[in-house]
């Protein structure tokens, strides 16, 4: 049956900011869904709070509302737009939870909005642990022995009855939040308390642990007529016990017998039919490796991280088809976009192997607990495709950008066998390297299988890789013959890995390959195992059979993507890459994307003319360049990942469009940059590059503390810190020089001024600044973690003039063609430059949307030779809009045990939301609500622990908050200070005093907000850390910068009815 004619206007709910457990995959699926609906003539209204996405571009939906994802704001959009339908399954867990809340609160019924796609009843049956378990029992699908609990004591009683270990799974949460495996009652109490608080319905499933069983997933599609297919089945290399988002995953599954495969396929179809899914659904099973016993773990009745992976692994666009099914189409009525011949009811066939490896953020968090479990901690992932497992796996390892090209890891060489055993039994993000080291020392595969639950098939494959590494280490380059090299390449070894083992350069291996004509061939991802001719230009490299790439004679450009999502390099760079491709297409240039992230829009096969799903390493990128012979390569939009290739491409005489390697070096090399600033008469905070701890101490003495220290050539403020005394500086420098001895450490005088930022475009003669952005928090908080305001609110015309002057001088002197990002500090009336990035930055999507200047489009045209004066947006500073927009950071620290919450110069946020208002206070209110930072006033209490440097600044803010009804709880010093100023305050004991003390108050959630300004270098930092962690783990707001608290107080003082007076704004207008 074709299109349901009653559907005219659909509201799509996005997934909001990127957090751990809900990343770029929902930008990809949401964008696909909106485009599928529009292609059918449906009017699409989108609400999503995330400005960094392609999904929130004005071209993707007919109406776009960048508003907080709360019932109040969604109701305002419904009232204004009057959609007839709601599509909920494209916004991840956030979208599902909101759809259920909209239904249960009566809003959908009130405005006569129907849910299309999977129904609310089916969502509840899939998400509510009790309803799901009951249904499985009804249809005869096995589930693990379990109990639904809503309080602590019932959970303890059940665990005692069935025995430990038990798995805790909260209902309606994201990425396993609040869950875990408890080995005893003490652990259960901690996990259960967290799970009950984080579940939106206060419900947790406790189940007997089947840790060590295989974890298998099926991605299934079903239409409203009951047609049902499995798109892809995937096997987690890590067994049950590690969240699938933190597992290495292989598709198709490699170790299932045909009987096991068919058994689980039948079960997944049985489940999806019984729940009544209409669209896509992910089903997770645990499978006993020794018998045919299996159990259903859970389902996701929506598109998910796994469905994005399955879409990219097979070329089958799940989200697009789910949207079409929601409109009434059957699977047998929708054409396969890849073949244009077959229909969506044909199950995809894979004649290659896909490996997904998670990307974890532990490089950002010194001292983090890295142990993996049922709670997801990865920020992103890479995907690699190969003709065999070894090839895909080794491609995956080098795609992670952790400096590893093989399984040989120096760190594990010093470990004893019992230490290695511990490491593989309590897995962390580096377990695979510990495993390889055990195999290198001939530890028996059977024993490793027993202690880890990892299938012998995978262990044997890893053993083969390790043995080849050892063989290479014992050889010389003269021993490497054509056959051996060819075999190593077929199994995924990179030139660099081979060269490192043979102690020669990658160039030596490249020359041998050239002499022997060992070149990669590129195969097409075609959904049908070569059965039908495919039209998708989507390729992966192998060293196998013939090449399927047709190289054209058109003028072509290669755009290098940004790789996996990580803190400091997120979805913003994918946004820039996609817009670059779109701009090139308009210029009739053939576009080629190279990227390895399965979650993103850039790796959708119909975005570019050709997509190469490959690692972003020198060798892999060079192979594609040699194949395609492009006019040039664009690195500017792929973040630091792409920029790192600049020098290599220069050595190979490959043309980079826009900014060159020398220009990048001028901006990033401290001495060259200082010389440039001096020549241009531009100020910067005093400082220099130092090469030893002693030199650092001398420089700090000359500058005076506090000083800002950081490595050179980093992104996201990685490794950056403000140090207040010699002890802290020695600790920092000692660690920094251990990590990197080849580059200097930069040391600057720290100025606590106003931070200002611009993204500008230069054509070599003129510049265009779309907008001047001002940071709410003073310098010292990383720009990615600051609340950013546009138009700037406190920057005078004189300073704006200087910003224009300095930006123009720098862009022209460096020779920028395209994008440049500059960060300034205004301090005591003077303007200083603190950083110049000769590339697109993470603020590009935000400033593009709020200034309505298509920045990437203009920058791309400029790179291809256009002049700013001819492009219709003028030069110098673009006119400011009437509305005020604020970008508010969103953090995922709750998901990462034992990591610091406090704001500082190293970036910690994973995502962002936008607040748009008629004035700054309205915009801030929306931004804080959208980021879940606004105090709920449920209890009206603020816990304040303020260090001595901040007490004078804190008092006027506290007075204002007291005026609007907040009460304070504080330790002795802060309490005394508040009372002296006539502010009502309740005293609380410190951590080391008897209970109930300050930590108990936080743990019992007796406050709405914790304000804690950290002290450095003494014991109270430890107290502060414990308080901040306890608050974050209980979902309480934590503020560590008084500028943020000042802004909240200003919003609270504002006399507007927060429900009635706030408008919602369509940004397409």
Swiss-Prot record:
Q: Where does Mn(2+) 1 bind?
A: 284, 298
- Spans traversing the lipid bilayer: none
Residues annotated for Mg(2+) 3 binding in this entry: 823, 835
Residues bound to ATP 2: 710, 749, 751, 755, 780-783, 823, 835
Q: What is the E.C. number?
A: 6.3.4.16, 6.3.5.5
Q: Which UniProt keywords apply?
A: Amino-acid biosynthesis, Arginine biosynthesis, ATP-binding, Ligase, Magnesium, Manganese, Metal-binding, Nucleotide-binding, Pyrimidine biosynthesis, Repeat
Cellular compartments per GO CC: cytoplasm
What's any GO biological process attached to this entry?
A: glutamine metabolic process
InterPro entries noted in UniProt? ATP-grasp (IPR011761), ATP_grasp_subdomain_1 (IPR013815), CarbamoylP_synth_lsu (IPR006275), CarbamoylP_synth_lsu_oligo (IPR005480), CarbamoylP_synth_lsu_oligo_sf (IPR036897), CbamoylP_synth_lsu-like_ATP-bd (IPR005479), CbamoylP_synth_lsu_CPSase_dom (IPR005483), MGS-like_dom (IPR011607)
Q: Where Mg(2+) 2 is bound, by residue?
A: 298, 300
| Comment on bound cofactor | Binds 4 Mg(2+) or Mn(2+) ions per subunit.
**Stretches the record annotates as Oligomerization domain:** 402-549
Query: Which residues does the annotation say bind Mn(2+) 2?
Result: 298, 300
Q: Which SMART domains match?
A: CPSase_L_D3 (SM01096), MGS (SM00851)
Cofactor(s) named in the record: Mg(2+); Mn(2+)
Binding of Mn(2+) 3 occurs at 823, 835
* Pfam families associated with the record: CPSase_L_D2, CPSase_L_D3, MGS
MGS-like domain: residues covered: 932-1069
Positions that bind Mn(2+) 4: 835, 837
Region ranges (Carboxyphosphate synthetic domain) = 1-401
Q: Which GO terms describe its molecular function?
A: ATP binding; carbamoyl-phosphate synthase (ammonia) activity; carbamoyl-phosphate synthase (glutamine-hydrolyzing) activity; metal ion binding
Family to which this protein belongs: Belongs to the CarB family.
Quaternary structure annotation from Swiss-Prot or TrEMBL: Composed of two chains; the small (or glutamine) chain promotes the hydrolysis of glutamine to ammonia, which is used by the large (or ammonia) chain to synthesize carbamoyl phosphate. Tetramer of heterodimers (alpha,beta)4.
- Record text about domains: The large subunit is composed of 2 ATP-grasp domains that are involved in binding the 2 ATP molecules needed for carbamoyl phosphate synthesis. The N-terminal ATP-grasp domain (referred to as the carboxyphosphate synthetic component) catalyzes the ATP-dependent phosphorylation of hydrogencarbonate to carboxyphosphate and the subsequent nucleophilic attack by ammonia to form a carbamate intermediate.
Protein name as it appears in the record = Carbamoyl phosphate synthase large chain
- Organism per entry: Clostridium botulinum (strain Eklund 17B / Type B)
Q: Which gene encodes it?
A: carB
């Amino acid at each position: 049956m074709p299109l349901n004619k009653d559907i005219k206007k659909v509201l799509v709910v996005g997934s909001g900011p990127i957090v751990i457990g809900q990343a770029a995959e929902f930008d990809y699926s949401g964008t696909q869904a909106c485009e599928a609906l529009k292609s059918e003539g449906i009017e699409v209204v989108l609400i999503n709070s995330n400005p960094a996405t392609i999904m929130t571009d004005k071209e993707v939906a007919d109406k776009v509302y960048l508003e907080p994802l709360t019932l109040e704001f969604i109701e305002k959009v419904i009232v204004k737009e009057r959609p007839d339908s709601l599509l909920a399954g494209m916004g991840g867990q956030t979208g599902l939870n909101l759809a259920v809340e909209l239904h249960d609160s009566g809003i959908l019924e009130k405005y006569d909005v129907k849910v299309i796609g999977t129904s609310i009843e089916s969502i509840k049956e899939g998400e509510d642990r009790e309803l799901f378990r009951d249904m499985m029992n009804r249809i005869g699908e096995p589930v693990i022995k379990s109990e639904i609990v809503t309080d602590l004591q019932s959970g303890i009683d059940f665990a005692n009855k069935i025995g430990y270990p038990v798995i805790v799974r909260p209902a309606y949460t994201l990425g396993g939040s609040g869950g875990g495996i408890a080995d005893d009652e003490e652990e259960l109490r901690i996990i259960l308390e967290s799970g009950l608080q984080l579940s939106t319905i206060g419900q947790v499933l406790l189940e007997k642990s089947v840790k060590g069983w295989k974890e298998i997933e099926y991605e299934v599609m079903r239409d409203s007529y009951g047609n049902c297919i499995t798109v892809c089945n995937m096997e987690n290399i890590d067994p049950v016990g590690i969240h699938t988002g933190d597992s290495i995953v292989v598709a198709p599954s490699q170790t299932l017998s045909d009987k096991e495969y068919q058994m689980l396929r039948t079960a997944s179809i049985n489940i999806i039919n019984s729940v009544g899914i209409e669209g896509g659904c992910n089903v997770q099973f645990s499978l006993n490796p020794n018998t045919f016993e299996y159990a259903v773990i859970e389902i996701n009745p929506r598109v998910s991280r796994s469905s994005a992976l399955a879409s990219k692994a097979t070329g089958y666009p799940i989200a697009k088809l789910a949207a079409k099914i929601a409109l009434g189409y059957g699977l047998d009525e929708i054409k396969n976009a890849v073949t244009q011949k077959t229909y969506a009811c044909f199950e995809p066939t894979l004649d290659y192997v896909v490996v997904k490896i998670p990307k974890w953020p532990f490089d950002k968090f010194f001292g983090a607990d890295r142990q993996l479990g049922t709670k997801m901690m990865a920020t992103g992932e890479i995907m690699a495709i190969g003709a065999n497992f070894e090839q895909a796996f080794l491609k995956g390892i080098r795609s992670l950008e952790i400096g590893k090209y093989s399984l040989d890891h120096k760190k594990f060489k010093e470990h004893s066998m019992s230490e290695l055993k511990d490491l593989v039994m309590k897995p962390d993000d580096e377990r695979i390297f510990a495993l390889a080291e055990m195999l290198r020392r001939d530890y028996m595969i059977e024993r490793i299988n027993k202690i880890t639950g990892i299938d012998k098939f995978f262990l044997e494959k890893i053993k083969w890789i390790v043995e080849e590494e050892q063989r290479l280490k014992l050889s010389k380059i003269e021993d490497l013959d054509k056959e051996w090299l060819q075999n190593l390449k077929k199994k995924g070894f990179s030139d660099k890995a081979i060269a490192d083992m043979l102690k020669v350069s990658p160039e030596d291996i490249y020359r041998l390959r050239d002499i022997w004509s060992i070149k990669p061939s590129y195969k097409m991802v075609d959904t049908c195992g070569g059965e039908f001719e495919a039209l998708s230009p989507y390729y992966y490299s192998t060293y196998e059979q013939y090449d399927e790439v047709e190289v054209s004679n058109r003028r072509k450009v290669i755009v290098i993507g940004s790789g996996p999502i990580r803190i400091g390099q997120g979805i913003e760079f994918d946004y820039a890459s996609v817009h670059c491709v779109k701009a090139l297409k308009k210029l009739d240039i053939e576009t080629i994307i190279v990227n390895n992230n399965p979650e993103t829009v850039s790796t959708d096969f119909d975005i570019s003319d050709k997509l190469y799903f490959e690692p972003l390493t020198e060798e892999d990128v060079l192979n594609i360049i040699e194949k395609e012979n492009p006019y040039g390569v664009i690195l500017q939009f792929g973040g630091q990942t792409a920029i790192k290739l600049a020098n290599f491409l220069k050595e190979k005489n490959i043309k980079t469009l826009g900014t060159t390697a020398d220009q990048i070096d001028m901006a990033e090399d401290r001495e060259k940059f200082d010389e440039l600033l001096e020549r241009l008469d531009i100020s910067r905070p005093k400082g220099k590059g130092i090469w030893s701890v002693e030199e650092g101490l001398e420089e700090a003495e000359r500058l005076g503390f506090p000083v800002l220290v950081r490595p050179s050539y980093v992104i996201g403020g990685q490794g950056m810190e403000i140090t207040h005394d010699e002890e802290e500086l020695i600790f920092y420098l000692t660690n920094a020089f251990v990590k990197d001895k080849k580059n200097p450490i930069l040391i600057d005088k720290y100025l606590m001024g106003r931070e200002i930022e611009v993204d500008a475009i230069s054509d070599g003669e003129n510049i265009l600044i779309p907008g001047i952005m001002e940071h709410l928090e003073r310098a010292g908080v990383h720009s990615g973690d600051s609340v950013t305001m546009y138009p700037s609110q406190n920057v005078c015309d004189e300073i704006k003039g200087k910003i224009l002057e300095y930006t123009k001088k720098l862009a022209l002197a460096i020779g920028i063609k395209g994008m440049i990002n500059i960060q300034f500090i205004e301090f005591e009336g003077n303007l200083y430059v603190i950083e110049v990035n000769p590339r697109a930055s993470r603020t590009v999507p935000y400033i593009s949307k709020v200034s309505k200047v298509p920045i990437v489009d203009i920058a791309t045209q400029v790179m291809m030779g256009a002049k700013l004066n001819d492009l219709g947006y003028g030069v110098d500073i673009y006119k400011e809009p009437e509305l005020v927009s604020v970008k508010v950071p969103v953090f995922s620290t709750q998901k990462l045990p034992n990591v610091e919450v406090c704001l500082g110069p190293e970036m910690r946020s994973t995502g962002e939301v936008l607040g748009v208002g008629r004035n700054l206070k309205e915009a801030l209110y929306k931004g804080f609500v959208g980021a879940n930072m606004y105090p709920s006033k449920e209890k009206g209490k603020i816990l304040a622990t303020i260090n001595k440097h901040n007490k004078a600044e804190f008092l006027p803010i506290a007075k204002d908050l007291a005026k609007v009804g907040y009460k304070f709880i504080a330790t002795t010093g802060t309490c005394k200070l508040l009372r002296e100023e006539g502010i009502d305050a309740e005293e609380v004991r410190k951590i080391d005093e008897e209970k109930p003390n300050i930590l108990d108050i936080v743990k019992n959630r007796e406050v709405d907000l914790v304000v804690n300004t950290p002290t450095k270098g003494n014991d109270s930092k430890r107290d502060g850390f414990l308080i901040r962690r306890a608050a974050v783990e209980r979902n309480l707001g934590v503020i560590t910068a008084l500028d943020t608290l000042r802004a909240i107080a200003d919003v609270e003082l504002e006399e507007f009815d927060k429900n009635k007076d706030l408008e919602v704004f369509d940004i397409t207008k």
